[in-house]
Amino acid sequence: DDLKVLIMDEPTSSLSQQEVKVLFKIMRELTAAGISIVYISHRLEEIMEIGDHVTILRDGKYVADADVKDIDVPWIVHQMTGGAKSYPKRDREVDWSKVENVLEVKDLCLPKAGGGYLVDHLNFELKKGEVLGIYGLMGAGRSEVFECLMGLHPEHTGQIIMEGTELHIKSISQQIDSGFALIPEDRQMQGLVQTLDIEKNCALSALKRYKKGPFLDSKKEAEKVDQEIKDIQIKVADKKLPILSLSGGNQQKVVIGKGILTEPKILLMDEPSRGIDIGAKTEVFDIINKYAEEGLSIIVISSELQEIVSIADRVIVLSNGIKTGEFFGNEIQQDTLVLASYKGHHIEEKES
């Protein structure tokens, strides 16, 4: 009865569309009862749907505010980025048929409890320096592919061949040694140790590389971390500060830097721009582009259509664990990806 102001911070980040509708209905009931709501979100379409008034912050500072009825999404984007570029479509003049494979996945299957497959006889390859996108709806099996590649599911079947040699995967540490690095979907739970500072988080996966006999070479560790902070432009006042002192975008850069410091041949990125603002997304895309140009092979999972269209050289689409489409270059269009993402559902419906 005493509630006057309700603050909601990214309340829809893990909700389905139907659940979002329920939340918005409750919010409208609360505002009708006289309760004020501060709604923090990077999902601009939600701001336009549920908001009455919007305030834009950039780098912790006030930029602008307006009534929602007087503005549109491009106005918000302009205020958030300060007129910075929207990320252009990736367009490289590369004859991929002449580029060697770094990774080949053949007939990959991951059994599902109760029968069927989470990943169903999947085949794909990855070229040196290529950005391969994996698109699909929730439950498509995308993250499970990464989990198989990183050794989390030793029960998987099929062949995983890296630079011509078949891998017999047993553990995550083995896969890191083999040249894989994973940027997980949930950076807070899986990508960061919240009790450690920025430097220790950045160095964590590459500690083997800083061994000096039975000890760690702290000087070498610090030099490598400093260089990575500079290379991917992590905005940090002091690397000894707690990791949670950073913005979401800079925390994500630390997770990416941690992976890069293991000197991988293949970088797996699961929803790398989730929960960060538009400006930080552009910076993450720049990082992807930079390392791909240097020859790093990258696989990106994304639920954001515009994002995957922009950054990928090639996209495979999964639905219910089945590969339902593969698109190259200018074939990568939002409508074709969406259509392919529904094919597996239709297959399952016909079989059941």
Regions found by a protein language model. Name each.
Residues 1-352:
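Glycine-rich phosphate-binding loops of nucleotide-dependent enzymes
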